[in-house]
């Protein structure tokens, strides 16, 4: 008998059907000489410190660095601590028996770093010695599964992939366990979660937040002139210079008005080619789904995974935007299929030869770029269909012709000032025709030449203000994670920097969601805004190694080298252990930042604990309560006396100097609501607002 193990029951069911394992047993299918079983995610995980006999959250026990990591069945949290998940334990027993009864194991977990680890951890935990081979496929269509089963690969081929996955898992454990415990011990109360990837990600969100909020807009003035264009149209020039003072701008404006004409000093005309966009990888799909449709990164990943399991698209957790030559031979057939979908009628030219910008086998790693499979997309929800059609539409774009434009830049002089206008005309629409993006052209520029004199129709002066960088959205944060904070627009350069990004395409959505779950940031429309807790953590760790984005990017680069067989995993392990010792020491030394003093106030929530003043937070010292009150409210830090008013009366006096997320100043009362969260009460509503906080 051979045992096939899949990552999920739904995938196991499809494989079982194909190999003839039609008899349903407890935890597996059987038949045709096969047993087809499954995991449900990780059945086995790394043990917590108590699994090594080490008590957690004790300063003298840190850092916890096991000589050898222990594997245990997946744990669930109970009132008495963590215990093995009973359903997981049952499935492990089933898998163990099947492994030992088999002559061969076929590994059919997801074909990627995490899928490999799911199997290898389970294999090692069971103490199994049965030889295994790998089913490595990029889609779950019947054709792909059958072809994969005919071409099974040696299990050892993916040893380096496993070693990279294991190194990532152990490094996350070392940094997360030790960092979280060290910072929480330093704080004295509460739990402050930190992690190898989550903390640098939070740091990018907080740094952008403060850059945005502390930005001071500066006024500037700009001049404009208008002259006759083509077909009775008007061409508007703008001054190259922007003046910081109104007076010189106004003085020049008056001269321009009096001049009556402008003289062309330079006229440049060029052909501009816009390359077709590359195919989607997961991160690019998530970014565009967020920007265009408001989907979260996690939502897009979940939808893509569903589409994959429905056999509609190829493997979603890919980091490549290219396909190899053998896949390119299938593209004409897939484009013809897309062209028959009602959404893309008349968008695919059946006679056109697909272009090759997205074809490069050397840039394909585990999996190629996202493609539709040619299975009909029936009965999809609105959201699922949106993501499916994004992938289909991008395929049409990627294999279309380039967009070619004729561009013109004309510079003119008037009253000693330089004015510029730019325009373009599309000569070949190419890929931009797919979504009807033939663009509203800026301006059609007449055939002006140097020294031509232009009669002015009008002149104007406008006042503007400089703007800060916007707050991060999930789309911009994914871009920042992809390039470790470097701001790069070019697709090809982004691809080159992927090994230096933080997180992986498969993990970035989960990292972002972790920051929400930990209460470190929240969504405000499309923007990501750090919470008071997130800002408090950032203020403590922002200059420390744990928040160093570039260093985290280097760790990801090292993991990629392990995966390629270029770096021994033991070398990485030694480096991450040294890093763990350093960040643990740094975080434990934060206790002076968390030095506390008694406020003299009872906790308004539990009535038994005393509220303790810390640097950034006031917290109840009753471990069962731990009510936190963060000092920082809307860019204003509450004083000790203001905090005492809040604790004793349930509200402060009317306070000045707050600043909204839009940068506007306001006055307000800070009060407790019914759940002892702080809220603002505004003067005009003060008489009708009933304060929820109670005086103890």
Language-model-detected regions and their locations in the chain:
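Intrinsically disordered, low-complexity regulatory segments
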Residues: 1-169, 173, 179, 350, ...
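C-terminal or mid-to-C-terminal helical accessory/interaction module adjacent to the motor/catalytic core
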Residues: 87, 142-227, 269-270
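Short glycine-centered, acidic/aromatic-flanked micro-motifs in structured strand/loop junctions
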Residues: 109, 287, 317
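Basic, low-complexity terminal or inter-domain segments flanking catalytic cores
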Residues: 2, 81-83, 125, 180, ...
């Amino acid at each position: 008998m051979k045992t096939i193990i899949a990552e999920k029951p739904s995938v196991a069911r499809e494989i079982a059907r194909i190999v003839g394992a039609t008899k349903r047993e407890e935890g597996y299918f059987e038949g045709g000489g096969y047993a087809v079983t499954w995991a449900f995610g990780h059945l086995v995980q790394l043990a917590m410190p108590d699994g090594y006999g080490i008590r957690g959250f004790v300063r003298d026990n840190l850092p916890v660095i096991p000589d050898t990591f222990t594997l245990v069945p997946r744990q669930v949290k109970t009132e008495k601590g963590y215990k093995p998940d009973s359903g997981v334990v049952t499935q492990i027993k089933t898998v163990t028996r099947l492994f030992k009864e088999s002559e061969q194991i076929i590994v059919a977990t997801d074909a990627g770093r995490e899928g490999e680890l799911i199997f290898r951890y389970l294999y090692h935990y069971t103490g199994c010695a049965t030889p295994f081979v790998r089913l490595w496929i990029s889609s779950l269509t019947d054709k792909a599964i059958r072809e994969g089963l005919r071409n099974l690969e040696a299990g050892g081929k993916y040893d380096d992939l496993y070693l990279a996955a294991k190194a990532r898992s152990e490094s996350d454990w070392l940094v997360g366990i030790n960092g979280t415990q060290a910072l929480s011990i330093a704080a004295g109360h509460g739990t402050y979660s930190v992690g190898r990837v989550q903390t640098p990600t939070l740091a990018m969100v907080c740094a952008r937040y403060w850059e945005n909020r502390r930005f001071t807009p500066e006024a500037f003035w700009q001049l404009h002139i208008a002259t006759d264009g083509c077909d009775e149209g008007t061409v508007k020039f703008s001054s190259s210079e922007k003046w910081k003072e109104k007076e010189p701008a106004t003085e020049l404006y008056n001269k321009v008005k009096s001049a009556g004409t402008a003289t062309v000093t330079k006229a440049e005309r060029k052909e501009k080619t816009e390359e077709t966009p590359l195919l989607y990888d997961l991160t690019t799909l998530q970014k565009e789904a967020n920007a265009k449709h408001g989907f979260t990164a996690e939502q897009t990943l979940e939808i893509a995974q569903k589409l994959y399991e429905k056999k509609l698209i190829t493997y979603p957790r890919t980091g490549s935007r290219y396909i190899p030559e053998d896949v390119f031979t299938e593209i004409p057939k897939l484009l013809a299929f897309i062209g028959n979908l009602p959404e893309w009628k008349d968008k695919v030219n059946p006679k056109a030869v697909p272009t090759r910008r997205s074809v490069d086998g050397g840039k394909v790693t585990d999996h190629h770029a996202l493609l539709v499979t040619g299975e009909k997309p029936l009965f999809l929800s609105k959201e699922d269909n949106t993501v499916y059609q994004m992938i289909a539409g991008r395929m049409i774009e990627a294999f279309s012709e380039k967009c070619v434009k004729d561009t013109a830049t004309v510079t003119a002089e008037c009253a000693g000032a330089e004015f510029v206008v730019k325009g373009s005309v599309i000569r070949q629409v190419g890929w931009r025709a797919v979504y009807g993006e033939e663009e509203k052209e800026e301006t059609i520029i007449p055939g002006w030449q140097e020294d031509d004199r232009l009669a002015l129709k009008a002149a104007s002066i406008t006042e503007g203000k400089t703007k800060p960088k916007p707050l991060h959205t999930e789309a911009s944060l994914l871009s920042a994670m992809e390039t470790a904070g470097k701001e790069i627009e070019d697709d090809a350069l982004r691809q080159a920097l992927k090994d230096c990004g933080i997180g992986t395409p498969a993990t970035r959505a989960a990292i972002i969601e972790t920051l929400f779950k930990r209460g470190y940031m929240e969504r405000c429309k499309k923007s990501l805004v750090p919470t008071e807790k997130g800002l408090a953590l950032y203020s403590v760790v922002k200059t420390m190694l744990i928040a160093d984005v570039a260093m985290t990017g280097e760790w990801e680069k090292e993991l990629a080298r392990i995966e390629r067989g270029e770096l021994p995993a033991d070398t990485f392990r030694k480096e991450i252990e040294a890093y763990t010792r350093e960040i643990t020491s740094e975080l434990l030394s934060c206790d002076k930042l968390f030095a506390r003093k008694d406020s003299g106030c009872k906790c308004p929530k539990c009535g038994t604990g005393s509220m303790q003043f810390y640097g950034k937070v006031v917290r109840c010292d009753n471990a069962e309560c731990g009510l936190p009150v963060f000092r920082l409210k809307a860019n204003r830090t509450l004083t000790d006396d203001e905090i005492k008013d809040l604790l004793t009366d349930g509200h402060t006096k009317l306070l000045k100097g707050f600043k909204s997320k839009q940068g506007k100043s306001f006055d307000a009362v800070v009060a407790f609501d019914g759940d002892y969260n702080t809220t603002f009460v505004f003067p005009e509503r003060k008489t009708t607002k009933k304060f929820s906080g109670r005086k103890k």
